[in-house]
């Protein structure tokens, strides 16, 4: 008996779906909830009115973003500047630098 009582909600949902399909087939679309309510008016060339919650959320997300960028730059700057160390210029030869030998006139 308890198995049948668990199936009762599914029967109710199925009945509602069938009634909705029959109503659409008969041309009766039911209640339309799309019009007549309060709408946000468009604001041409004006800033939108933000709520305090939206301002706080925006500040929090932008702070989190900049914290992450600066943290990663500070702790892993090779990702931005490159992975290879700059060679020591004192070990370069004159030939590599394009300087002609001293004995050549």
Curated annotation (Swiss-Prot):
<dbReference type="GO" id="GO:0005739">
    <property type="term" value="C:mitochondrion"/>
</dbReference>
<comment type="similarity">
    <text>Belongs to the complex I NDUFB2 subunit family.</text>
</comment>
<dbReference type="GO" id="GO:0042776">
    <property type="term" value="P:proton motive force-driven mitochondrial ATP synthesis"/>
</dbReference>
<keyword id="KW-0999">Mitochondrion inner membrane</keyword>
<keyword id="KW-0249">Electron transport</keyword>
<dbReference type="GO" id="GO:0045271">
    <property type="term" value="C:respiratory chain complex I"/>
</dbReference>
<dbReference type="InterPro" id="IPR026627">
    <property type="entry name" value="NDUFB2_animal"/>
</dbReference>
<dbReference type="GO" id="GO:0009060">
    <property type="term" value="P:aerobic respiration"/>
</dbReference>
<feature type="transit peptide" description="Mitochondrion">
    <location>
        <begin position="1"/>
        <end position="33"/>
    </location>
</feature>
<comment type="subunit">
    <text>Complex I is composed of 45 different subunits.</text>
</comment>
<protein>
    <recommendedName>
        <fullName>NADH dehydrogenase [ubiquinone] 1 beta subcomplex subunit 2, mitochondrial</fullName>
    </recommendedName>
</protein>
<dbReference type="Pfam" id="PF14813">
    <property type="entry name" value="NADH_B2"/>
</dbReference>
<dbReference type="GO" id="GO:0005743">
    <property type="term" value="C:mitochondrial inner membrane"/>
</dbReference>
<keyword id="KW-0809">Transit peptide</keyword>
<keyword id="KW-0496">Mitochondrion</keyword>
<comment type="function">
    <text>Accessory subunit of the mitochondrial membrane respiratory chain NADH dehydrogenase (Complex I), that is believed not to be involved in catalysis. Complex I functions in the transfer of electrons from NADH to the respiratory chain. The immediate electron acceptor for the enzyme is believed to be ubiquinone.</text>
</comment>
<keyword id="KW-0472">Membrane</keyword>
<feature type="region of interest" description="Disordered">
    <location>
        <begin position="86"/>
        <end position="105"/>
    </location>
</feature>
<keyword id="KW-0813">Transport</keyword>
<keyword id="KW-0679">Respiratory chain</keyword>
<feature type="compositionally biased region" description="Acidic residues">
    <location>
        <begin position="93"/>
        <end position="105"/>
    </location>
</feature>
């Amino acid at each position: 008996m308890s198995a049948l009582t668990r199936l009762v909600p599914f029967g109710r949902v199925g009945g509602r779906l069938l009634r909705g399909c029959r109503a659409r087939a008969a041309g009766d679309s039911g209640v339309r909830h799309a019009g007549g309510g309060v709408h946000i008016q468009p604001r041409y060339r004006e800033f939108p009115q933000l709520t305090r919650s939206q301002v706080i959320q925006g500040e929090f997300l932008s702070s989190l973003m900049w914290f992450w960028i600066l943290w990663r730059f500070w702790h892993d700057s090779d990702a931005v500047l490159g992975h290879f160390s700059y060679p020591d210029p004192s070990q370069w030869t004159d030939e590599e630098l394009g300087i002609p030998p001293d004995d050549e006139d």
